[in-house]
């Protein structure tokens, strides 16, 4: 390791380490088509050991989208299965926990009311036949509180970085043209009910927020181009979707909800001139402007995610989220690893998606339950899930391990970085907020593939079996030194340049002193100044807890994980470093809910 002399932005001379990646260890996890390995750690390898074959070059200087998360949906069916399993806590730990067996799922797309995987059909505002409730006086989430919401709360306690999205399959029957939750008779939202439907969705976001489940993303209709005959759904034209979004955005803002709206939430179909093609989301984006944050996509039908890139290129400031795809056989490990791992997950991520979301999280041995005494559902999905429950038995299917190759190693806020595809080895790479690198590779071919991975001039070799998937991780960052600037260009500052324990940390006019010279250490996610650590006072976790300088002690109060949006996240509290009050000099910093606003954006050295 060599040392070089650099200047901080304040002109202070600093000694900065530069890293050579020769001999750097690479950790490997492997899943094989024959099930001999299931996300199994392999013997570490190292850069500099050489290799042969085509070269995958991982380039951290070419960056793309930041990651929101990986997961699926705790549908009514999924929640019912997990809730009633004697292994409930173990299942939840394995899905959302960060322990050795947990895969740290970080994204959940939740139905607003019923979906096609529900034990009964219901909305959040049901009234009797022939009645209506435009005042929404009968709105209630009581059915969700039986087992869905408790599991969502448990999931968030296991992974505080979990992001929630909401999606309605149907408006309440009294708002629809066929007066039914089903999609029969080309069911649609009644013209003129767009405003009350927007209020209905706003009340959903408020009610879930009150339960400690913030809805970060919301679409207004699941698969709006498809009117299902035997389960809830409804058609919605681009024009009507635009009207709903333009009503909903100000309603959410007035209700204090920091919720982003997504257009479409339907398939990757990309047949020019054949409805629905890319014109649907483009029409909505054009008609709604800043009210729509992005586009949600499903991986069915054409199974070609290039439509994501086409719409992203036309509207480059918008988010792309892949929000649903399911497989039909949990026992087809070769097909599942390729279909869900390469064709869905990797390809979606290489086409700008910030999420990978499969469908149901857990189903029973019959692929359900779907209804309880209601009409027979024919949803065309002989679906499996990451988890199968069968009485006291629990099976973790191929989808579980495929998701784990991403969610366990690619953290929210990670940036996708450039990597090239070689032969049958499809792949995607990321730089995490702690600057570690994760490369996920999937050999879609029928024979083993030998290749090299090159990073910053060093390389290693690997042979990936046919139909197998591997995740490679290695430390990618180096210690950084300099100023940390925040809102209105003010610097993070140790008050009075006092190195004593409990000295407040504030924002202050940048002056180039040592009180504003910080060390950002990616190896342990600490931030130092004057020989001590940035610290949450008393190790507390509540909103508004002050931030101070304190002797470094290795506790969670001193862990700060940089996020892709510029925030500094404290995992122990589940909150972010916040410039209290919005940017006046001498304002003390605190921790607060991560709203990702200007008060929480920091420019690191």
Language-model region placement:
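Soluble non-cytosolic domains of exported or imported proteins
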Residues: 85-86, 142-146, 191-199, 235, ...
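Substrate-binding and catalytic surfaces of secreted/luminal carbohydrate-active proteins
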Residues: 23-60, 164-166, 199-217, 227-480
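Conserved residues at the C-terminal ends of beta-strands
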Residues: 73, 111, 221, 298, ...
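Secretory targeting and sorting signals
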Residues: 1-22
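Short acidic/His/Gly/Ser-rich catalytic and metal-binding motifs that mark active-site loops
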Residues: 117-121, 172-179, 224-229, 271-274, ...
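N-terminal catalytic cores of secreted or lumenal carbohydrate-active enzymes
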Residues: 35-215, 236, 246
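Residue-level detector of short, conserved catalytic/binding motifs and their immediate flanks
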Residues: 54, 68-70, 103-110, 162, ...
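Lectin-like carbohydrate-binding module/patch detector with strong preference for beta-trefoil
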Residues: 478-605
């Amino acid at each position: 390791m060599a040392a070089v002399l650099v200047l901080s932005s304040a002109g202070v001379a600093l000694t900065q380490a530069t890293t050579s990646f020769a001999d750097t260890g690479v950790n490997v996890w492997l899943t094989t088509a024959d099930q001999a390995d299931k996300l199994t750690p392999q013997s570490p390898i190292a850069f500099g050991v050489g290799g042969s074959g085509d070269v995958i070059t991982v380039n951290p200087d070419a960056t793309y989208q930041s990651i929101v998360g990986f997961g699926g949906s705790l549908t009514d069916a999924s929640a019912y299965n997990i809730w009633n399993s004697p292994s409930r806590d173990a299942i939840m730990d394995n899905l959302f926990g960060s322990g050795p067996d947990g895969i740290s799922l970080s994204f959940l797309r939740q139905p607003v009311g019923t979906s096609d995987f529900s034990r009964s059909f219901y909305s959040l505002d049901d009234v009797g036949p022939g009645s209506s409730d435009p005042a929404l006086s009968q709105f209630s989430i009581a059915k969700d509180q039986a087992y869905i919401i408790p599991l969502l709360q448990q999931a968030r306690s296991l992974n505080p970085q979990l992001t929630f999205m909401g999606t309605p399959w149907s408006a309440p029957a009294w708002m629809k043209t066929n007066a039914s939750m089903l999609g029969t008779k080309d069911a649609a939202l009644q013209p003129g009910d767009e405003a009350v439907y927007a209020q209905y969705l706003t009340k959903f976001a408020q009610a879930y927020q009150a339960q400690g489940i913030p809805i970060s993303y919301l679409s207004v209709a699941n698969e709006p181009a498809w009117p299902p005959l035997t389960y809830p759904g409804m058609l919605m034209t681009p024009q009507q979707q635009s009207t709903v979004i333009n009503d909903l955005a100000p309603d959410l803002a007035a209700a204090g909800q920091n919720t982003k709206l997504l257009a479409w939430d339907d398939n990757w179909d990309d047949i020019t001139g054949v409805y629905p093609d890319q014109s649907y989301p483009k029409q909505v984006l054009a008609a709604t402007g800043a009210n729509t944050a992005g586009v949600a996509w499903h991986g069915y039908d054409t199974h070609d995610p290039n439509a994501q890139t086409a719409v992203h290129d036309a509207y480059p400031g918008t988010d792309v989220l892949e929000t649903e795809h399911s497989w039909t056989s949990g026992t087809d490990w070769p097909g599942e690893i390729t279909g869900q791992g390469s064709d869905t997950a990797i390809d979606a991520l290489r086409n700008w998606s910030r999420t990978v979301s499969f469908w149901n999280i857990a189903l029973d041995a019959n692929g359900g339950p779907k209804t309880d005494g209601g009409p027979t559902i024919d949803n065309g999905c002989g679906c499996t899930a990451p988890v199968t429950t069968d009485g006291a038995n629990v099976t973790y299917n191929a989808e579980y391990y495929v998701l784990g190759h991403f969610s366990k190693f690619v953290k929210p806020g990670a940036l996708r970085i450039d990597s090239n595809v070689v032969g049958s080895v499809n792949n995607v790479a990321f730089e995490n907020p702690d600057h570690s690198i994760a490369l996920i590779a999937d050999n879609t071919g029928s024979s083993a593939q030998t290749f090299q991975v090159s990073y910053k001039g060093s390389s290693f070799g690997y042979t990936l079996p046919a139909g197998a998937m591997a995740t490679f991780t290695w430390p990618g960052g180096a210690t950084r030194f300099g100023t940390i600037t925040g809102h209105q260009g003010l610097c993070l500052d140790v008050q009075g340049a006092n190195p004593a324990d409990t000295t407040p940390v504030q924002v202050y006019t940048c002056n180039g002193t040592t009180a504003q010279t910080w060390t950002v250490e990616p190896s342990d996610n600490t931030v130092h100044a004057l020989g001590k650590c940035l610290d949450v006072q008393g190790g507390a976790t509540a909103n508004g807890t002050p931030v101070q300088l304190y002797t470094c002690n290795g506790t969670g109060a001193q862990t700060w994980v940089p996020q892709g949006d510029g925030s500094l996240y404290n995992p122990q509290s589940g909150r972010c470093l916040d410039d209290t009050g919005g940017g006046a000099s001498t304002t003390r910093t605190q921790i607060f809910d991560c709203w990702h606003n200007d008060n929480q954006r920091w420019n690191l050295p």
